[in-house]
Structure formats: C-alpha cells, structure tokens
Amino acid sequence: MVTVVYKGFEWDKKKAASNEKNHFITFKEAVSIFSTPHYFRTSFVHKEYQELRYISVGVWQGKEITVIYTLRKKRRRIISARRSRDYEKEHYQDYLRKIGAAR
C-alpha cells in the first residue's frame, strides 16, 4: 500500500485511482471543500471496521460533493469522494439555512 500525504490529508494511492475512475473526482480536488467557508459534517461508526468515520458535504466546482474520511495520526485519511446523494444535499442545504448562508 502506497500512502499519499497532502496538506494534512492522506490516502491510499490505489484507492484514489479507483475513486477517480468511478466518481470522476480526485482526492486532491475533493479536499478543497475543507478550505471553503462552509461545509457540513456528520459521523458514524463503520460496522465492519468499528471505526469512526466522517461524512463531509461541501461545494467543489459549483456542485455538492461528499467526502468520507477517518482520522489517523492527526491527518484526515480520505476513503471516498463523490457527487452528493440527494439526501446529503438536503442535509447540506438545511445546514446552510441554519447558519444563514443558504445558496
């Protein structure tokens, strides 16, 4: 396994290539949502791995995207990045309305 480290993030190189092929977004592009003024975050425990994972929804190139990651050694380890599902977009828009930043 080859780990890529980039600005406080990390990811598996093969997983990143697979993600780009399937979802048409690189992990490097996806992490840009964390430098935007507003992104929504929630968490869950992955049943199989018993690991706390985070789901963040933000905007990249004018579209809502979802980034799934976990924390490892003070870095965010990216697991997946993709276009947001409808219910994720709804949660994100609700969050923006709540903080007074609706698009």
Each model region followed by its residue ranges:
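Ribonuclease/tRNase effector modules and their secretory precursors
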Residues: 1-103
